[in-house]
Regions:
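A short glycine-rich, aromatic-capped structural motif
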Residues: 41-43, 47-157, 163, 256
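Hydrophobic h-region of N-terminal signal peptides that target proteins for export
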Residues: 10-18
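Acidic glycine-/aspartate-rich tracts in secreted/extracellular proteins
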Residues: 124-126, 264-266, 333-335
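Sec-dependent signal peptide recognition
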Residues: 2-8
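Functional-site microenvironments in short loops/helix caps that host divalent-cation chemistry
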Residues: 152-295, 299-300
Length: 342
């Protein structure tokens, strides 16, 4: 009897802690949504759609507030940038992209920024300097948030070009995916891609991996042996906290802070960059906040990852975790693209 009472007491305490954490997360998300609306000037309809996605998720946010300990504060980030006279606003980029804090995607070898056909968020969502990236977001939710804001999820080659400083023609080996299951298709395509680009490996900030250049000197929670919501804090930095973590095209935090969802097409009809409503499979790009001390996997710009927790981008059960966020792309001159098909 005493044991039963003790178990019930423990369960009640755990439930109360979870309820309080849920309440804090919702409050943090409401504050974040207000900040997004104020900075970006999205329409009420756009914000209603994003609000429904964020508040309806139950997990999406800037980390589990019960355990997350961010590596730096928003105030310290803001003060540091002000002291260095750094302002991330770029009027030329805004004219080209039609939005704040986006960078044109192009190949400087034969194009200029004004000829870009797409743009990418300069920071991880919410795409606001000195704000923490949103994590615990499924790939399907990320795609829907981007669509609600008149943007879209980036294709893998767009992210790679933004990082490496030149968006080249897509080189997906769709022929290697024909007739294959998703996992096998990804394995064959990535092997060919990584072999083709591995000799020219580079990072967003230069040709060699460099500690201290990006937001990657953080620490995992002591209880984080796997990836559970209650064990792993999203101990990220504010975005833009490291001005040196900048690609040649003016995009920040592609290495470190939070890894990012991207769309990996397995055939030409799954390319978001060409206007397709049917997306491909999930791919994780970049790296996250512990890479100065523990490099969990390669993170050079054009490296393509294994099919970790893989599935269709629009699968309602697509993967989410404590160090995985996203950023959006935008096809220039279209005012957005149709919503992706589930």
């Amino acid at each position: 009897m005493k044991l039963r009472l003790l178990v019930m007491l423990v369960l009640m305490i755990g439930a109360n802690v979870a309820t309080r954490a849920d309440g804090v997360l919702a409050a943090q998300n409401r504050e974040l949504l207000e900040h997004i609306a104020a900075v970006h000037g999205y329409t009420p309809q756009q914000m209603d759609e994003v609000r429904a996605l964020v508040l309806g998720s139950g997990y999406m946010g800037q980390g589990n507030p019960a355990i997350t300990v961010h590596a730096d504060t928003r105030a310290a980030c803001t003060a540091r940038l002000a002291n260095a006279a750094i302002d991330y606003r770029n009027a030329d980029f805004e004219n080209i992209c039609g939005a704040k804090y986006m960078a044109p995607l192009y190949d400087p070898a034969h194009e200029n920024a004004a000829q870009a056909r797409a743009c990418i968020d300069q920071f991880e969502f919410p795409n606001i300097p000195c704000e923490y990236p949103v994590v615990w977001v499924k790939a399907s939710e990320a795609a829907q948030v981007c669509t609600a804001l008149g943007k879209r999820l980036c294709d893998a080659h767009e992210w790679e070009g933004a990082c490496d400083g030149a968006v080249q023609a897509p080189d997906y080996r769709f022929d290697l995916a024909e007739g294959m299951a998703m996992g096998a298709a990804v394995a064959r395509m990535r092997a060919a891609h990584n072999q083709a680009h591995g000799r020219q490996a580079s990072w967003s900030y230069g040709p060699q991996f460099k500690r201290g250049a990006c937001a990657q000197d953080g620490r995992k929670s002591a209880s984080c042996a796997g990836g559970g919501y209650t064990q792993c804090g999203s101990n990220t930095y504010p975005t833009g906290d490291f001005p040196t973590c900048r690609s040649p095209l003016g995009v920040y935090d592609l290495n470190g802070n939070a890894a990012e969802h991207m769309n990996l097409p397995l055939n030409a009809e799954q390319m978001a960059s060409t206007g397709s409503r049917v997306l491909g499979v999930t791919e994780m790009k970049g790296s996250w906040f512990i890479f100065d001390t523990y490099r969990a996997h390669p993170d050079w710009c054009r490296w393509r990852a294994p099919f970790w927790h893989g599935g269709r981008v629009m699968d309602a059960h697509s993967h989410a975790n404590y160090h995985l966020g996203f950023r959006c792309c935008k096809t220039v001159g279209t005012g957005g693209l149709p919503a992706p098909s589930p």
